[in-house]
């Protein structure tokens, strides 16, 4: 497995209970991200307090990237967080996702220049569980953002 300095970008908006579970799972990775950036689309003070609490519990830098709440602008705040990221490899998740302990390791293991990795969630229901594996897309050679 080739090692990359990995930045984990977590987008959130006013749901600190879910973000806490996401942060807990982020800090329990078998391959830790080099940094965590919380892309906050205008949450209230509870989110900032939660992030401050988690900063005190880990040596992994946690960066809170916040923008004023002027409506749904998650794309804008993700872009701002990515601009602040220092990793060569960026993993982006929503703040209501609980990461499998090998989530970062699995991403890094299939990462290559010019490759975009996507996947879906494990959906847990009262009578069923579904899972989709990560997929690597090789066609992102001339991506323009």
Positions of predicted regions on the chain:
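N-proximal low-complexity "stem/linker" segments adjacent to membrane-targeting elements
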Residues: 1-25
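Short alpha-helix within the catalytic core of nucleotide-sugar-dependent glycosyltransferases
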Residues: 23-24, 48, 87, 101-112
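Glycine-rich, basic loop-to-helix element that forms the pyrophosphate-binding segment
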Residues: 68-85
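Conserved donor NDP-sugar-binding/catalytic core segment of glycosyltransferases
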Residues: 102-134
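Acidic donor-binding segment of Leloir-type glycosyltransferases
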Residues: 25-66
